[in-house]
Amino acid sequence: MKPTTIASLQKCKQDKKRFATITAYDYSFAKLFADEGLNVMLVGDSLGMTVQGHDSTLPVTVEDIAYHTAAVRRGAPNCLLLADLPFMAYATPEQAFENAATVMRAGANMVKIEGGEWLVETVKMLTERAVPVCGHLGLTPQSVNIFGGYKVQGRGDEAGDQLLSDALALEAAGAQLLVLECVPVELAKRITEALAIPVIGIGAGNVTDGQILVMHDAFGITGGHIPKFAKNFLAETGDIRAAVRQYMAEVESGVYPGEEHSFH
């Protein structure tokens, strides 16, 4: 199987072909996803909540991300593998580069960082040193204490215009992917159409180029609150491999996410 690359996703955007991505944290699930053709994965700092049992992503360390990245890479050698830089791992461009090098050596193809225009110099430094960057705007979980909880972002003209400005700034600085989380569908459409780079949505409607879900949400194994944008594909299929295929098929056809999973 040919490796999936950033260029693969760029071609999907050009061809208007939606693509599915998912979080992965270990060898076994990574191998299962790859075997079913789901070849874009994120080692997210969401592991702090789903794997480690914390109430936020803030306790996750670079070493945690590197450990899980190495495990996922062994399970899916040809996938496009993104890895989060966790909270306080990129406070300066120099710190970001040092920590990005750690997760890249562990097997990541790209690092994901949360934030807007203040990250421009960091994105430039990373991309100029051969570290591909995925931006993350909207609901950025590392900022949960600023937001006062996990809330929809970008509502209203001023907030929406700021997110669009942030997205354009990240792209101009060299970011090659963007994740949009928990924003109104209308804003997600504006940003997706304004950018040349692929945009991956989570809680952003079906108007983005790709979708991502935390695997625990996709299979209904999350305790407690279930996000509005989540769908339990395992409940519908009764088989985890079939659930992966169903998720991919519904993303590619635009069936998922539906109106019931979207914000306005």
From Swiss-Prot:
Keyword Transferase: yes
Pfam families per UniProt: Pantoate_transf
Pathway the protein acts in: Cofactor biosynthesis; (R)-pantothenate biosynthesis; (R)-pantoate from 3-methyl-2-oxobutanoate: step 1/2
GO CC term (a single one): cytoplasm
Cofactor, free-text remark: Binds 1 Mg(2+) ion per subunit.
Annotated catalytic residues: 181
Cofactor: Mg(2+)
Residues that coordinate or bind Mg(2+): 45, 84, 114
Positions with a binding annotation for 3-methyl-2-oxobutanoate: 45-46, 84, 112
Predominant location: cytoplasm
GO biological process: pantothenate biosynthetic process
Domain of life: Bacteria
Enzyme class label: transferase
Disulfide links within the chain: none
GO molecular function: 3-methyl-2-oxobutanoate hydroxymethyltransferase activity; magnesium ion binding
Keywords assigned by UniProt, alphabetized: Cytoplasm, Magnesium, Metal-binding, Pantothenate biosynthesis, Transferase
Protein EC: 2.1.2.11
Protein location: Cytoplasm
Catalytic activity: 3-methyl-2-oxobutanoate + (6R)-5,10-methylene-5,6,7,8-tetrahydrofolate + H2O = 2-dehydropantoate + (6S)-5,6,7,8-tetrahydrofolate
Similarity comment: family membership: Belongs to the PanB family.
Function: Catalyzes the reversible reaction in which hydroxymethyl group from 5,10-methylenetetrahydrofolate is transferred onto alpha-ketoisovalerate to form ketopantoate.
HAMAP family in UniProt: PanB (MF_00156)
Quaternary organization: Homodecamer; pentamer of dimers.
Identification of the protein by name: 3-methyl-2-oxobutanoate hydroxymethyltransferase
Organism: Escherichia coli O139:H28 (strain E24377A / ETEC)
Lineage, broadest ranks: Bacteria, Pseudomonadati, Pseudomonadota, Gammaproteobacteria, Enterobacterales
